[in-house]
Design a protein with these regions (language model features):
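Extreme N-terminal segment that seeds HTH/winged-HTH DNA-binding domains in transcriptional regulators
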Residues: 1-33
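Short glycine-rich, Thr/Ser-proximal phosphate-binding strand/loop in the N-terminal lobe
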Residues: 2, 84-116, 155-156
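Conserved phosphate-binding catalytic cores of ATP/NTP-utilizing and phosphoryl-transfer enzymes
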Residues: 56-80, 180-203
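Gly/Thr-rich phosphate-binding beta-strand-loop-beta motif of the actin/hexokinase/Hsp70
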Residues: 67-102, 203-205, 210-215
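Glycine-rich phosphate-binding loop and adjoining helix at the ATP-binding site
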Residues: 104-200, 319-331
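Glycine/GP-enriched mid-protein hinge/lid loop-to-helix segment characteristic of carbohydrate kinases
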Residues: 104-106, 170, 176-280
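Adenine-nucleotide phosphate-binding core of ATP-dependent small-molecule kinases
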Residues: 116-135, 251-254, 261-321
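Single conserved hydrophobic/aromatic residue that forms the stacking wall/gate
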Residues: 334-345
Length: 345
């Protein structure tokens, strides 16, 4: 009996996952693409519709006979919350079952390793969710942290941004009444980009420190020690600038957002304003930044042959500069005859 129940649960999970990734599908398409018999699909879909997980979303054009009903995920069936912890801020986002943002907020709150921080965060989250009509519909909370996280030991092994080592996540977890999942910030951002869409891709997190992540066959790859994707500590300029890790010439020292502000600007926004106003020093710094970023992208492209997604603070400003960056990248890849992979933001 247990085996039969487990098989049914697995079938339902596959159907739900398929519908979530294929909006407005049909029972016929589910049966065909998941290789599940039509009677099994009908039984499971009907039960999922009765429980409110799936809903009818319309009808397909008729080719004769009855019109097939299209089905999709019920967006309000459940919700999930994401929390982004940084050194000086907390970002919060509530999404529905279609990954559509219902609410978002960002609050200035300095991180502290003390237990009082956990209490303050709990109060902040409760306030954020106070207008949620059915709080029991919250599936769980995902918390992203800038640092190396050990899922087995349930701790932050090290975070330069938060200035912590071997920090237990138990107190944070106990601050909430729902399931809590912790993930490295770059890994979380990679998953948010829809790894099923990209299948094989690299994510570069261009924040005050340079992070990275990548997925293979639609699955996040963490490596043997959860350190995969530490692209910020690949040597970009041998013997170059000193990195906070102690080495010289790391990509972080050339491609992190902090290299643009560098004590002269209070924020990246102010730097970009100076750039748009034609400030010559800002223009020179930006040109150098793009040169270094192009080299890093080229190296990653040569090593992994994947799409590269540019995110983080700098990623938000790159839309108007992709042509210049693309030209710099192509100079490094000019000898490659096959079509190059995409660089996206």
């Amino acid at each position: 009996m247990a085996g039969k129940a487990e098989k049914k649960s697995n079938t339902r999970s596959r159907i739900i996952s398929y519908v979530m990734n294929n909006e407005n599908t049909s029972k016929v398409e589910i049966s065909k693409n998941l290789n599940i018999s039509m009677p099994t699909v009908l039984s499971n879909v009907n039960e999922l519709m009765e429980s409110g997980v799936l809903v009818e979303t319309g009808e397909y054009a008729s080719t004769g006979g009855r019109k097939a009903k299209s089905i999709g995920i019920n967006p309000s069936y459940r919700y999930a919350m994401g929390i982004v912890i940084t050194a000086n801020h907390v970002g919060m986002t509530l999404v529905n079952m279609r990954s559509e943002i219902e609410k978002t907020d960002r609050v200035r709150m300095k991180f502290s390793p003390e237990t009082s921080y956990c209490g303050e965060l709990s109060i902040l989250v409760k306030k954020f969710l106070e207008d949620m009509e059915e709080p029991e519909k919250l599936l769980g909370i995902g918390i992203s942290i800038p640092g190396i996280i050990s899922q087995e030991q349930h701790l932050v092994v090290k975070s330069h941004a938060l200035k912590i080592e071997n920090y237990s996540l138990s107190f944070l977890e106990q601050s909430f009444s729902c399931p809590v999942y912790f993930e490295n910030d770059a890994n979380a951002a990679m998953m948010a980009e829809d790894i099923h869409q990209y299948k094989n891709a690299i994510y570069l997190s261009l924040n005050n420190t340079l992070g990275g992540a990548f997925c293979i066959d639609g699955k996040l790859f963490s490596g043997q020690n959860q350190k995969a994707g530490e692209f910020g500590h690949m040597i970009l300029v041998p013997g170059g600038r000193k990195c906070y890790c102690g080495k010289k010439g790391c990509a972080d020292a050339y491609c992190a957002a902090s290299t643009l502000t560098d004590g002269k600007y209070e924020s990246l926004e102010l730097f970009m304003e100076a750039l748009s106003e034609g400030n010559t020093k800002a223009q020179k710094k930006w040109a150098d930044y793009l040169d270094n970023l192009a080299i890093l992208i080229s190296n990653l492209r040569m090593a992994y042959d994947m799409d590269i997604i540019l995110g983080g603070e700098v990623g938000g400003y790159l839309a108007d500069h992709m042509l210049a960056l693309g030209e710099k990248v192509m100079l490094s890849l000019i000898h490659i005859s096959e079509p190059t992979r995409r660089v996206v933001i």
